[in-house]
Amino acid sequence: MCNTPTYCDLGKAAKDVFNKGYGFGMVKIDLRTKSCSGVEFSTSGHAYTDTGKASGNLETKYKICDHGLTFTQKWNTDNTLGTEISLENKLAEGLKLTLDTIFVPNTGKKSGKLKASYKRECFSIGSNVDIDFAGPTIYGWAVLALEGWLAGYQMSFDTAKSKLSQNNFALGYKAADFQLHTHVNDGTEFGGSIYQKVNEKIETSINLAWTAGSNNTRFGIAAKYKLDCRTSLSAKVNNASLIGLGYTQTLRPGVKLTLSALIDGKNFSAGGHKVGLGFELEA
């Protein structure tokens, strides 16, 4: 069993209630399909309603399951090319090794990362290293799990400056229908979240964050309600009086529609509200 989350996935259930089912100020189309030879294709396009700017990306993925290899190619409209090669569960159960490279043809810029992660039932660890001869940055994280309790640490070290550039701690508790997550980033940013699955139809989440030396406290409440197996409603509000509403409908198997709106509660009659439209297609 390798079910201990990574550091970035701590508190993920609460984040999903706040983030999924919304797409304010944009029209978005996602398409996923798989060829007969096993190559997975996914493409996404965005058009922002306030600026009119459009962007998109294409990703292809091919897995050689017998050898634990996955090859991924990425391209976006900024003309950035990415290649990722990963080896998983072959050298050891729960071990994943990845080489991730990026190339920008317009400028000739090249960059890359070496990644390694290892997951077991009671812990998970990982490290990334930038491929930079001027002085790579080393990233590392670790999560320990014991009887539902989770403790995590995340750091990054800039070898060129011999300086610790990131120093984060997290502590949480995870049960079947309840999750608690707290974190401290660089000793100055504090935050916490609570996730509660009330029943099979209702999920709720609370998020709180503040910065030391500042009166800027951020607080939000979010909920998701499943009307049936095809339809769900989402809503959230924060202490800045920004109200988010979302509606998701599965029109048919493989076709999903998302409508969302962001309302400024302090300036309701002044306009400036945002709406969003999203399509997800899978074949």
From Swiss-Prot:
The modification Phosphoserine is found at S241. The modification N-acetylcysteine is found at C2. GO terms for cellular component: membrane; mitochondrial outer membrane; pore complex. One of its GO terms (biological process) is sperm mitochondrial sheath assembly. The chain crosses the membrane at residues 26-35, 39-47, 54-64, 69-76, 80-89, 95-104, 111-120, 123-130, 137-145, 150-158, 163-175, 178-185, 189-198, 202-211, 218-227, 231-238, 242-251, 254-263, 273-282. The keyword Transmembrane applies. InterPro entries: Porin_dom_sf, Porin_Euk, Porin_Euk/Tom40. Interacts with ARMC12 in a TBC1D21-dependent manner. Interacts with MISFA. This is Non-selective voltage-gated ion channel VDAC3. It comes from Sus scrofa. The gene is VDAC3.
